[in-house]
Amino acid sequence: MPLSASLLGKNSTYKDSYDATLLFKIPRINNRNELGINSNNLPFYGVDIWNTYELSCLNKNGKPWVGVGTFYIPTDSENIVESKSFKLYLNSFNNFVVESIEELERIILQDLSNVTHAKVTGQIFPINTKIEFGLPSGKNIDDLNIECNNYCPPDNSLIEYEDVLVEEEINSNLLKSNCLVTGQPDWGTIVIKYRGKKLKHDSFLKYLISFRNYNEFAEQCAERIFTDINNSINPDFLSIYIVYTRRGGIDICPYRSLDQNYNLPSNKRLIRQ
């Protein structure tokens, strides 16, 4: 179905009964074709981490239960899930009776796997689980004294480098783009690890800021940034991790890496989550 058929930007009615058909799929291939990415031979590995904070159901006695969930959608999935449809889907469990939280987890993982055409993993946690806040790893580049005048479209010509090999990790809290359909802001913290020609931090920060008024889904922004860096410096190693702020009870955190045997970064919430 075309993106115009989704519920994004439209008035919606919350279903009072569980309904897996609420999940709306978006093919990854459309954006990847634009970026020159071969979906049959991806230049990266990774996942999209979805953290959900509005999750509830009823136990067999009719008593409500609330929790949080974390779900991992692999980058080789055929589709992503449109976030508003996922919110409506999760809320369709509000009056749904389950025998156990394990049953709820199984249902959600199966539904997500069906719509994305991939093996989705994840876990649901009780609401009283202790969660610690974290800090983005690496050197923050936000305090650099730069002059900016490009806020759209993203300009990969701004990525400059020095002809010296380094291994470093940098981060920025200044990444912002807008939802492709609604124009709502997506605020993100990005962490980049790489080994290769040294990125000039001032020009790279300008590049990140050039996304500021750009309309694109979060997962697609991540792959655009990864592709632009990879094409610019051809690093021996590269990974990017973007932690987006919560909207509609959900935050999305894409991770991409050149390393097939990658280790996922800590999924600790940052201060803006």
Curated annotation (Swiss-Prot):
Subcellular location: Cytoplasm
Recorded GO CC terms: cytoplasm
Source organism, top-level taxon: Bacteria
TM ranges: none
EC top class, as a word: oxidoreductase
Keyword line: Cytoplasm, NADP, Oxidoreductase, Queuosine biosynthesis
Reactions the enzyme catalyzes: 7-aminomethyl-7-carbaguanine + 2 NADP(+) = 7-cyano-7-deazaguanine + 2 NADPH + 3 H(+)
EC number: 1.7.1.13
Binding site for NADPH: 83-84, 247-248
Residues reported to bind substrate: 81-83, 218-219
Location, primary (coarse class): cytoplasm
Active-site residue numbers: 179, 186
One Pfam family of this chain: QueF
Any GO BP: tRNA modification
Gene Ontology molecular function, alphabetical: preQ1 synthase activity
Pathway assignment: tRNA modification; tRNA-queuosine biosynthesis
InterPro entries on file: GTP-CH-I_C/QueF, NADPH_dep_7-cyano-7-deazaG_red, QueF, QueF_N, QueF_type2
Subunit structure: Homodimer.
Family assignment from sequence similarity: Belongs to the GTP cyclohydrolase I family. QueF type 2 subfamily.
Described function: Catalyzes the NADPH-dependent reduction of 7-cyano-7-deazaguanine (preQ0) to 7-aminomethyl-7-deazaguanine (preQ1).
Record-given protein name: NADPH-dependent 7-cyano-7-deazaguanine reductase
Organism: Rickettsia canadensis (strain McKiel)
Gene name of the encoded protein: queF
